[in-house]
Amino acid sequence: LLSGDWRRYLRLGSRSAYAIRAFGFYSGGDRPRRVNIGGTLGLRGYPEFGYIVGTRAYMLNQEIRFPVLTHLTLGSPLGDVDFPEIQAGFFGDIGKAVLHQDSERALLGSWGISFRLALGPFAVLRLDLGRRFSDGNFRGYSLDRSQRDPGFVHFFFGYNY
């Protein structure tokens, strides 16, 4: 079993950053393990569990993150309500998962825009609007027709990569 997950964050300005993540996985032998690379922390716009699976996989995520709304305060009779900063990001993801016996699977990817609201130091509320792309060869991925449509909207609660 070989697995690697490399991440780098480069500051572009005082409030913006470029985030990149590279992931690779290989498992061989009589009973190789499988890895899933779909979902919000992998290939955005593709299913989270059981569809983009393989004993060999690689993935690249890239994102440019920047603030959209830095301060929002709403007044009420009970006092002001301060909201945290709203950030946006342009993203691009690409990857492939291959089972040992099936090497003809497509290279999958997605691109789009993401909006996020930090909920404390570790949690984030995120909305992704994007487009899927591939070479059209979905054989072996078990994706239904709606999961092959180009456009997607996805809501996520969790953490950033």
Residue ranges and their predicted role:
Residues D93:
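Short basic (Lys/Arg) and small-residue
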Residues L1-F90, V98-H100, F138-R148, F155-Y161:
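C-terminal outer-membrane beta-barrel translocator/porin domains of Gram-negative envelope proteins
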Residues D102-Y161:
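C-terminal beta-signal and terminal closure region of outer-membrane beta-barrel proteins
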